[in-house]
Regions:
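Loop-to-transmembrane alpha-helix initiation sites
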Residues: 140, 144, 157-165, 175-190
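Final/C-terminal transmembrane alpha-helix of multipass membrane proteins
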Residues: 240-262
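Cytosolic, membrane-interface loops and tails of multi-pass inner-membrane proteins
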Residues: 25-67, 204-237
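Alpha-helical transmembrane segments in multi-pass membrane proteins
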Residues: 10, 14-15, 19, 23, ...
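N-terminal signal-anchor transmembrane alpha helix
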Residues: 2-34, 254-258
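Multi-pass membrane catalytic core of lipid/isoprenoid biosynthesis enzymes
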Residues: 52-89
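Interfacial segments of multi-pass membrane proteins
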Residues: 62-65, 88-91, 124-154, 166-175
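Helix-coil boundary and interhelical linker segments in multi-pass alpha-helical membrane proteins
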Residues: 1-13, 85-101, 132-139, 172-184, ...
Length: 266
């Protein structure tokens, strides 16, 4: 009974802390006349504006406030989960997995915050902040290898953006073989997919109208993160056949690293 009670309490605490939206708080301070929910993008040869579907997080806030404030918001989003995770993992319950529930529900709160009519961000900063506490080595290895595999082997910006997160499932399975870690990794991936549904629906609609390419190009120019990812994609494409070679090497290296993680508790 105590276990269930602590799981519920950990989840509630994580959710309410995660629901704090620094993007909305700072936007209200710096640009009170602006709204993250009403951001529009004007397409060429079209009288209508398209609503920008990026959630209400650091990336979208950076379009209005600038890159510097976008970075600050991203850091604050990381800190808001890092602090309670450290408290739960290392001080309150060092031998229990309650911190994983704080992390998972912190992400749910960030993406669907109760304070803001369940309109939140997409949780990239929250996921990174949580994983730094849960397994910092997983962040370093999977972000690097995920980007290399996504850009070099698959040649896709979308895969590169999310592959590192998908890789957390086999990583936790091989390294810990603990049901709590595995459930956390699966749940985080499900949350990430569900939070992208508005973007997916918009992309399908724009693709039917033949406006998807222009929307992507204009949206990419609006944020430093997207511009950086686009530059990385262009760089890897410029490598030609060497991109595939680098991708295969990255895949082999990934298999070796994961094998070491499983056999020697890396």
């Amino acid at each position: 009974m105590n276990i269930i009670l602590f799981i519920i309490l950990s989840s509630i605490i994580g959710y309410f802390i995660g629901s704090i939206s620094f993007s909305r708080i700072l936007l209200k301070i710096k640009a009170p006349s602006k709204s993250l929910d009403d951001l529009q993008l004007k397409l060429d040869n079209s009288e209508d504006e398209v609503k920008v579907m990026m959630g209400a997080g650091a990336n979208k806030a950076s379009i209005i406030l600038g890159t510097k404030w976008g970075i600050i918001i991203g850091i604050l989003d990381m800190i808001k989960v890092i602090i309670p995770l450290i408290i739960f993992r290392y001080f309150l319950f060092p031998n229990e997995a309650y911190f994983l529930y704080v992390a998972a529900f912190g992400l749910i709160g960030h993406n669907w915050p109760i304070y803001y009519r369940f309109k939140g961000g997409r949780g990239h900063s929250v996921m990174l902040g949580s994983l730094i506490v849960i397994d910092w080595l997983a962040v370093v290895i999977n972000v690097i290898l995920g980007n290399l595999l996504g850009f070099a082997l698959i040649g896709s910006l979308v895969f590169a953006s999310y592959l590192w997160l998908w890789m957390m499932i086999p990583w936790f399975l091989l390294r810990y073989f603990n049901i709590n870690f595995i459930i956390y990794a699966i749940l985080v991936n499900i949350i990430a997919i569900l939070s992208q549904i508005p973007e997916i629906k918009l992309y399908v609609k724009l693709r039917k109208e033949g406006k998807d390419r222009e929307y992507k190009e204009k949206l990419t120019k609006m944020t430093a993160q997207f511009r950086g990812l686009q530059k990385m994609e262009d760089f890897f494409k410029s490598l030609g056949i060497w991109r595939i070679v680098l991708g295969i090497i990255s895949l082999i290296f990934t298999i070796v690293i994961y094998t070491f993680a499983a056999l020697f508790n890396l």
